Amino acid sequence: MVDREQLVQKARLAEQAERYDDMAAAMKAVTELNEALSNEERNLLSVAYKNVVGARRSSWRVISSIEQKTSADGNEKKIEMVRAYREKIEKELEAVCQDVLNLLDNFLIKNCSETQYESKVFYLKMKGDYYRYLAEVATGEKRATVVESSEKAYSEAHEISKEHMQPTHPIRLGLALNYSVFYYEIQNAPEQACHLAKTAFDDAIAELDTLNEDSYKDSTLIMQLLRDNLTLWTSDQQDDDGGEGNN
């Protein structure tokens, strides 16, 4: 029998050493014990996989950019090598996302009780995020399918958060941040993205007195990111340059 506390301890240690693959493996094992995760464990799982997938997303962007430049050069051998390397990174990225989505569907979302709104929103947001990461690299029908799954998870989380969480709650704000990025970058719907981000920001500003002392720093940081994105997206719409949001 694997000791749960030892696994969590290993994840904490791996995080300090910035060994995120080890951290993710430890938290995957904790999740597969099929017991509800504490807030700390939930965050450890999220941080681990965000770093594991983040490294692949970053590599994929770099190689995709090189691939576009190489295609323009017309060197067939080099084009083939770059394409093969992009596909390798893509497969790794897809495997990580699938890992997380399986944990969410088979354990985490499934085991949330009706009234565990915070956990439910946290995990549904995560589900939306990982389908969004798949959408970044997918094409054609495959892309349409993962985009739809991402939208569905974000939308469900959004409804629950509006009904059961304070507008200043960091999880509700974080969801609005990522959902709006989904509209802007994946759906190419800047108006919806701006509307969602602005509403979340304004609602939080209107209820600043409800800010929990423990989450003050988290909430205000996300509000700042929402505002930064709004500024960027509004200026992008004016000069139509396109651009990436914070996520």
UniProtKB/Swiss-Prot annotation:
The keyword Cytoplasm appears for this protein: yes
UniProt site positions, description: Interaction with phosphoserine on interacting protein: 57, 132
One of the protein's GO biological processes: protein localization
MF (Gene Ontology): phosphorylation-dependent protein binding; protein kinase C binding; protein sequestering activity
Location(s) in or outside the cell: Cytoplasm
Xref: InterPro entries: 14-3-3, 14-3-3_CS, 14-3-3_dom_sf, 14-3-3_domain
Keywords: Cytoplasm
Family assignment from sequence similarity: Belongs to the 14-3-3 family.
Role, per record: Adapter protein implicated in the regulation of a large spectrum of both general and specialized signaling pathways. Binds to a large number of partners, usually by recognition of a phosphoserine or phosphothreonine motif. Binding generally results in the modulation of the activity of the binding partner.
Protein's name in the database: 14-3-3 protein gamma-B
Organism for this UniProt entry: Xenopus laevis (African clawed frog)
